[in-house]
Amino acid sequence: MDAEWSADTRRRAALHGLLADPARVAIVDLLAWSDASPSELGARLGLASNLLAHHVGVLARHGIVRRHRSEGDRRRTYLALVPGALDGVGAAGPARPAPSRVVFVCTANSARSQLAAAAWQRVSPLPTASAGTHPAERVASGALRAARRHRLPPLGEPRSLGDVLVDGDYVITVCDRAHEEAPGLAAGHWSVPDPVRRGDEDAFEAALAQIERRVADLAPRFTGPATTG
């Protein structure tokens, strides 16, 4: 008699089959750390555009990868892993040495990067900071209310990149415009929609939910004590 496998066992077996190709594993490994445009992925992996498009298409059709339009350059798309799609298959990619500090960057340093740094403080002992490419005069009121609702550490005043970044920082952009304005600056990119554009509480809740999920996923994947210098 054939064994009657559970739905979850069948799901994980199918995922292992999809990830049997080294190129797809490499794509998933990179996206586990950072959202990326197809051109960024191709450059990192050395894959021809048609071959990359094939593998991304397979991953997208099976609900592992999603595409979305940039909030900055509307001609540009970003690829990201679908939350929970790879649960149970151990496909998070290799760990990395802990940096001296994690710095979150957005354009105005008034919402997303502030919330990301505050969320990071709650789950990781690694030092953190936030900055903006064009800092606003003050933190968005919606971000302050969201931080209070979720009992996050107090948010700081908006600061510019030049006043914050030092050698050894691990930079994560949480804003498409900032990522595109300073190519090569960030070690990682999270394409988080700008809640200030909508301005309502739901927008800030959605942004913070995505940030908290990604912070919780990233923090334990740094290994060892923080590096210095």
Describe the predicted segments one by one:
Residues 10-51, 77-84:
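N-terminal helix-turn-helix DNA-binding core of bacterial DNA-binding proteins
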Residues 96-162:
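Conserved active-site segments centered on acidic
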Residues 56-57:
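Short, hydrophobic-biased segments on the C-terminal half of alpha helices
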Residues 78-102:
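Conserved segment of winged-helix/HTH DNA-binding domains
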Residues 43, 60-61:
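Alpha-helical residues within the helix-turn-helix
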Residues 62-72:
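Beta-hairpin "wing" of winged helix-turn-helix
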Residues 179-229:
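Phosphate-binding/catalytic loops
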Residues 172-180:
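Short, polar loop motifs at secondary-structure junctions
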